[in-house]
């Protein structure tokens, strides 16, 4: 389709000359300078590409600096302040840390109370030992042995697991 129009035959090359309406005179020095110029089209093209690459890299570096600045500003604005005075709605990182510490203290106290209750009623102490009063192996030990015996295989410890659940729940 378009290939016939874009091909030029060997003998069909024509040189067209346009004559301007006004007379253009170039000085002899300009013509000799253009003739003696060592830059070819290839060199000119390479220089133009280098210039464009330089401008693009400058623009990219400017954009990178602007983007990083915007990101840092956004990040700094989104972080909670350390001071209680600057905090918005009473929330600051120091107040949140204090709340977390108080909750951790309450949890440890709760865990200690639960352990004391279990020890008081004999639930955890008597049943977690290796052997119970009648000499049979404890449920925890049975479950541990079953898990170790079936290491890397599908587990067949359903009964031991159910007994352990009963022990823990109750």
Curated annotation (Swiss-Prot):
It is found in: Mitochondrion inner membrane. Transmembrane segments: none annotated. InterPro entries: DUF1690 (IPR012471). One of its GO terms (cellular component) is mitochondrial inner membrane. Pfam families: DUF1690. GO terms for biological process: cristae formation. It is a peripheral membrane protein. Its main location: mitochondrion. Disruption phenotype: Increases frequency of mitochondrial genome loss. Partially altered shape of the mitochondrial network with condensed, fragmented mitochondria accumulating at the periphery of cells. 20-40% of mitochondria exhibit an increased inner membrane surface and stacks of lamellar cristae disconnected from the inner boundary membrane. Keywords: Membrane, Mitochondrion, Mitochondrion inner membrane. Component of the MICOS complex, a large protein complex of the mitochondrial inner membrane that plays crucial roles in the maintenance of crista junctions, inner membrane architecture, and formation of contact sites to the outer membrane. Belongs to the MICOS complex subunit Mic19 family. Present with 3550 molecules/cell in log phase SD medium. Component of the mitochondrial contact site and cristae organizing system (MICOS) complex, composed of at least MIC10, MIC12, MIC19, MIC26, MIC27 and MIC60. This complex was also known under the names MINOS or MitOS complex. This is MICOS complex subunit MIC19.
């Amino acid at each position: 389709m378009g290939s016939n129009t874009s091909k030029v035959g060997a003998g069909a090359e024509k040189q067209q000359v346009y004559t301007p309406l006004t007379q253009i005179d170039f000085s002899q020095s300009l013509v000799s300078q253009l003739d003696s110029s060592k830059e070819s089209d290839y060199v000119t093209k390479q220089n133009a590409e280098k210039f464009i690459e330089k401008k693009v890299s400058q623009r990219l570096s400017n954009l990178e600096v602007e983007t990083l600045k915007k990101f840092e500003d956004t990040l700094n604005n989104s972080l909670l302040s350390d001071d209680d005075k600057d905090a918005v709605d009473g929330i600051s990182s120091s107040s949140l840390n204090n709340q977390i510490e108080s909750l951790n203290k309450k949890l440890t106290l709760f865990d200690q109370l639960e352990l004391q209750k279990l020890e008081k009623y004999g639930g955890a102490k008597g049943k977690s030992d290796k052997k119970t009063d009648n000499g049979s192996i404890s449920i925890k030990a049975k479950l541990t042995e079953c898990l170790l015996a079936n290491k890397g295989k599908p587990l067949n410890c359903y009964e031991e697991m159910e007994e352990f659940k009963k022990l823990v729940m109750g």
